[in-house]
Amino acid sequence: MTKRVFIAHGWDGYPEEGWFPWLKKELEARGFEVFVPQLPNAGNPRIQIWVPSIAEAVGTADEQTYFVGHSMGCQAVARYLETLPEGVKVGGAVFVAGFFKRLAGLEDAPDVQETDKHWLGTPIDLAKVKSHLPKSVAIFSDDDPWVPLDNQDDFRDKLGSEIIIEHAKGHFSGGRDKITELPVARDKVLSLAG
């Protein structure tokens, strides 16, 4: 059976952003089916809209199903995994610039603050997420302006993720940080799927 990878963009993201097209092409060249769905209303993301959108894109999840999340896409993937029926396991996930604990440096605009509170204030059962996720990797940058490094704690301690800290990659964004290739993400997907 073909291994499938679903890439979830972040807040204000889109499928052609940054390193997503490169990663899609790299993994397809190695025999994976890769999907990068446009999550609805990316400028004002909502859990109750994004999670069902991921579920619809995935269909039936199994051990041949892998995920890559970027920023808020990591939360969306984890919250999707939380909804899976008991006993269902996926192959693994690579989280890039993910967070459960806190964000930093956000604008004071009310809509930005409200979106931040929506995602960080809505409880998530990471033990349930872990029950569906046997293997994961969480990648951070030492100079991310929005995702402080203490976010790694939940990934390591509650999800059992391997932690990787990259140097000077910012938020791993295409526009702001000019990241159009991310070999560490490709390599970790290949390792998880190995």
Give, region by region, the residue ranges found by the protein language model:
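Conserved alpha/beta-hydrolase "acid-adjacent" motif
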Residues: 145-151
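Short beta-strand/loop motif that positions the catalytic acidic residue
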Residues: 132-133, 137-140, 144
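Active-site nucleophile loop of the alpha/beta-hydrolase fold
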Residues: 10, 39-42, 93-103
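Catalytic active-site module of serine/aspartate enzymes centered on a nucleophile-bearing elbow/loop
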Residues: 177-194
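Gly/Ala-rich beta-loop-alpha elbow adjacent to hydrolase catalytic centers
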Residues: 67-77
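Active-site catalytic motif of lipid deacylating hydrolases and related acyltransferases
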Residues: 2-63
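Catalytic histidine neighborhood in serine/cysteine hydrolases
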Residues: 31-35, 157-174
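Catalytic histidine-centered segment of alpha/beta-hydrolase-like enzymes
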Residues: 45, 169-182
